[in-house]
């Protein structure tokens, strides 16, 4: 606007209106903005009785107790998600109860509170006047179609994320582009909740007093209660700069798709996340190892394979499990028998991220037959597929409905080039034909129409006759119980995807067993009759032989210079010969796995503990303390060590560089005890070992309870007289002790006592 067009619209020598009894207790939340008091002035001039409260000086309970007649949320600096104090909680509580009006950040809080997103507009405006187009309803009732407004903002609600419960009530042109607009007003379709992005209280805004007056006329929490019909009408759409866009009904899929396109385009410009950055990382072979998605789907302990989904929210159900921990959920699914874990990585509607997938992949490290990992996302670019592979995905989702045939084919072939067979999703006969013609090995039939988000569980069955026999068909969406699954078994469906029902299940394993018609596949607890017993500090052939004949599983020799129990290499070699030539008194039975054991996932420590038990003889353990890796490797070869024990502060990574199982000692407050796929088993001990100092049993309990899959060897002050009692004190966590380690507890005057060795082994074996 030219300067000559600037008009001061502020009240000149104003006369305060009589007290408005229906606005006798208006609460104005101050988001620390100087305009708050201009808003206050306009409200008071209309007869309202107003109390101003800063956003961080009142709790929601205190605000509720004040029983406001109307709520006004002021402008303010920052972002509504992080800088609005009580504003969002107040809007969420009072919506539908009393009228609410938001100004600038106040409107952004409304959008954020109902699930929309506030982001940068590309403009930074400070005292800029614009032409407003509005729908003539709510705050705009009685105003001319075009109004001059004043804007102070760089953030605004984004068109693609405005939730279904809100409608855009006004807009302004974005910059010089007549085809692009910025949201200037929103209104709830049911509740008397309205916001404006501009400043009606500014002296350069036309009809600002009228807007506040219209708001203060409202007394009920809903439009119906106020006798108002605020459904958008023809006047607003006719005033829009691009009428077809304003009137078109946009599906949820289109909204999500548009939002993801914008987000991915922006992400691709960030240094370290550019396509060239991802490709360079991939060429360095840093992507985690992968498994075959189709092959894993063919392995299941149940009649149908389970694709278990990690799903915090959805457009149709809203929040499902907002605070769910993705890696913890993944471990539950794996133990319950899932063949595939689907990780939703879309952040706005489903509340997921690629970081969830990365954490899930890490959490499954070391499982004997881990589930395949699916990136469940709205994929339209090779970039997203490469990103998924680098994060640890074994497969990705390609939705036929949102991709033309050329793009679908390109993405399918690119995914295959990275070793990932995609899951191709269809919903109609035409889409199924496209997937079959593509040659997809795995086709998912979505029972939910992504245009309307309505569920029809019969969709999968109706499309089965189009599918080649060799193709794996998965039923997706809406499955909540055993009855939903029965028809799929009869129709030849090979897998089902379950999300919400699993996320809400109190017992994941029991729910899966009931759903799929099998027995709950809970992992067996370590046998309490066969703990590993390690006799450490062995210095003679006689001591080694006595320990083995008593039933010990592990014979430890100290290979650390300067320790009183250290043995020289020549003695170590003699002990090694004894260990390898002396048979167990009773061989352990060698069990051949039966049935479908390879179709299930066994936690790392349950599996690794079995590698420390030889069926016919004991194993020789060499104990090292902060010595060079090269020395450890040389001694392992020279002495024929079966196991290496690292008893100092050696890096965890060494465990992967040593060619035999590794026991690693941990103090009670040391990080990394439960880290999978490195050390074979952690050993809990105090100090440098051999001190005879008992561990704090309460702290041991806490450690064991912190991780269901943790298994440890217990050391520290054990002897023949206390080992049984100490194990019993651990109560229900005792089964996680898969072995015990003793040194000074079987000595007399610093020398190994053969009778004590025999007594300790007997006591330890009977303690479980």
UniProtKB/Swiss-Prot annotation:
User: Which GO molecular function entries does the Swiss-Prot or TrEMBL record give?
Assistant: anthranilate synthase activity; indole-3-glycerol-phosphate synthase activity; phosphoribosylanthranilate isomerase activity
Residue positions binding L-glutamine: 76-78, 108, 154-155
Residues the record marks as active site? 104 (nucleophile), 199 (for gatase activity), 201 (for gatase activity)
Q: What is its EC number?
A: 4.1.3.27, 4.1.1.48, 5.3.1.24
Pathway(s) it belongs to: Amino-acid biosynthesis; L-tryptophan biosynthesis; L-tryptophan from chorismate: step 1/5; Amino-acid biosynthesis; L-tryptophan biosynthesis; L-tryptophan from chorismate: step 3/5; Amino-acid biosynthesis; L-tryptophan biosynthesis; L-tryptophan from chorismate: step 4/5
Induction note: By tryptophan starvation.
* Region (Indole-3-glycerol phosphate synthase) residue spans: 252-516
Catalysed reaction equations from the record: N-(5-phospho-beta-D-ribosyl)anthranilate = 1-(2-carboxyphenylamino)-1-deoxy-D-ribulose 5-phosphate; 1-(2-carboxyphenylamino)-1-deoxy-D-ribulose 5-phosphate + H(+) = (1S,2R)-1-C-(indol-3-yl)glycerol 3-phosphate + CO2 + H2O; chorismate + L-glutamine = anthranilate + pyruvate + L-glutamate + H(+)
InterPro entries according to UniProt: Aldolase_TIM (IPR013785), Anth_synth/Amidotransfase (IPR050472), Anthranilate_synth_II (IPR016302), Class_I_gatase-like (IPR029062), GATASE (IPR017926), Indole-3-glycerol_P_synth_dom (IPR013798), Indole-3-GlycerolPSynthase_CS (IPR001468), PRAI_dom (IPR001240)
Cross-referenced Pfam families, in alphabetical order? GATase (PF00117), IGPS (PF00218), PRAI (PF00697)
Q: Where is the Glutamine amidotransferase type-1 domain?
A: 25-225
- GO BP, sorted A to Z: L-tryptophan biosynthetic process
List every stretch annotated N-(5'-phosphoribosyl)anthranilate isomerase.
532-768
Q: Name the job this protein performs.
A: Trifunctional enzyme bearing the Gln amidotransferase (GATase) domain of anthranilate synthase, indole-glycerolphosphate synthase, and phosphoribosylanthranilate isomerase activities.
- This protein is called Multifunctional tryptophan biosynthesis protein
The source organism is Emericella nidulans (strain FGSC A4 / ATCC 38163 / CBS 112.46 / NRRL 194 / M139)
């Amino acid at each position: 606007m030219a300067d000559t067009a600037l008009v001061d619209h502020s009240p000149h020598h104003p006369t305060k209106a009589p007290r408005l009894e229906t606005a006798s207790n208006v609460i104005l939340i101050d988001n620390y903005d100087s305009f708050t008091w201009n808003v206050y002035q306009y409200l008071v001039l209309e007869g309202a009785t107003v109390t101003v409260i800063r956003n961080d000086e009142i709790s929601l309970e205190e605000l509720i107790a004040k029983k406001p007649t109307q709520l006004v949320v002021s402008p303010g600096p920052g972002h509504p998600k992080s800088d609005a104090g009580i504003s969002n909680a107040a809007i969420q509580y009072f919506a539908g109860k009393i009228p609410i009006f938001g100004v600038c950040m106040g409107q952004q809080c409304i959008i954020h509170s109902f699930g929309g997103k506030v982001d940068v507009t590309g403009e930074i405006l400070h005292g800029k006047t614009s032409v407003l187009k509005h729908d003539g309803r709510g705050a705009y009732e009685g105003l001319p179609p075009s109004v001059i407004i004043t804007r102070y903002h760089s953030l605004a609600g984004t068109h693609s994320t405005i939730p279904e419960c809100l409608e855009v009530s006004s807009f302004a042109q974005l910059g010089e582009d007549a085809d692009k607009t910025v949201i200037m007003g929103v209104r709830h379709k049911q509740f008397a909740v309205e916001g404006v992005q501009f400043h009606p209280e500014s002296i350069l805004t036309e009809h600002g007093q009228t807007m506040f007056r219209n708001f203060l006329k409202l007394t009920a929490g809903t439009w119906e209660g106020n006798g108002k019909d605020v459904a958008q009408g023809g006047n607003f759409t006719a005033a829009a700069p691009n009428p077809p866009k304003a009137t078109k009904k946009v599906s949820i899929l289109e909204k999500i798709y548009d939002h993801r396109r914008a987000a991915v385009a922006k992400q691709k410009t960030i240094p370290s996340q550019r396509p060239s950055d991802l490709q360079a990382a991939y060429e360095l072979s840093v992507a985690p190892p992968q498994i075959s998605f189709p092959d894993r789907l063919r392995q299941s302990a149940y009649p149908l394979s389970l694709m278990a989904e990690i799903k915090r929210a959805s457009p149709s159900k809203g929040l499902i499990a907002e605070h769910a921990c993705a890696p913890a959920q993944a471990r539950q699914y794996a133990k319950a028998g899932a063949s595939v874990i689907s990780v939703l990585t879309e952040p706005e509607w489903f509340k997921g991220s690629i970081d969830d997938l990365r954490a899930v992949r890490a959490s499954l490290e070391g499982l004997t037959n881990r589930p395949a990992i699916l990136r469940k996302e709205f994929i339209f670019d090779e970039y997203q597929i490469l990103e998924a592979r680098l994060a640890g995905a074994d497969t990705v989702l390609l939705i036929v409905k949102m991709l033309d045939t050329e793009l679908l084919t390109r993405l399918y072939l690119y995914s295959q080039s990275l070793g990932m067979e995609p899951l191709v999703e269809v919903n109609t006969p035409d889409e199924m034909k496209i997937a079959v013609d593509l040659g997809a090995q795995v086709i998912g039939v979505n029972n939910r129409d992504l245009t309307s988000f309505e569920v029809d569980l019969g969709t999968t069955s109706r499309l089965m006759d189009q599918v080649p026999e060799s193709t794996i068909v998965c039923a997706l969406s809406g499955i909540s119980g055993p009855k939903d699954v029965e028809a799929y078994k009869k129709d030849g469906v090979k897998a089902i995807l379950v999300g919400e029902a699993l996320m809400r299940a109190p017992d994941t394993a029991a729910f899966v067993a009931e759903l799929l018609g099998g027995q709950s596949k809970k992992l067996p607890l370590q046998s309490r009759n066969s703990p590993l017993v390690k006799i450490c500090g062995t210095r003679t052939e006689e001591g080694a032989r006595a320990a083995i004949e008593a039933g010990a599983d592990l014979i430890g020799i100290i290979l650390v210079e300067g320790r009183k129990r250290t043995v020289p290499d020549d003695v170590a070699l003699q002990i090694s010969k004894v260990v390898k030539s002396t048979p167990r008194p009773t061989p352990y039975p060698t069990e051949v796995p039966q049935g479908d054991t390879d179709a299930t996932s066994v936690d790392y420590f349950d599996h690794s503990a079995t590698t420390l038990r030889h069926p016919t003889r004991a194993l020789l353990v060499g104990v090292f303390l902060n010595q060079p890796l090269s020395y450890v490797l040389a001694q392992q070869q020279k002495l024929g060590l079966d196991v290496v024990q690292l008893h100092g502060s050696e890096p965890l990574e060494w465990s992967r560089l040593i060619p035999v199982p590794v026991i690693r000692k941990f103090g009670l407050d040391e990080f990394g005890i439960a880290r999978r796929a490195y050390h074979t088993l952690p050993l809990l001990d105090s100090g440098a070992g051999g001190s005879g100092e008992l561990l704090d049993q309460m702290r041991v309990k806490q450690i064991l309870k912190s991780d269901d899959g943790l298994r440890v060897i217990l050391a520290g002050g054990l002897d023949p007289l206390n080992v049984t009692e100490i194990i019993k004190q651990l109560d229900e966590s005792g089964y996680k002790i898969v072995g015990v380690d003793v040194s000074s507890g079987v000595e007399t005057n610093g020398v190994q006592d053969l009778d004590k060795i025999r007594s300790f082994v007997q006591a330890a074996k009977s303690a479980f």
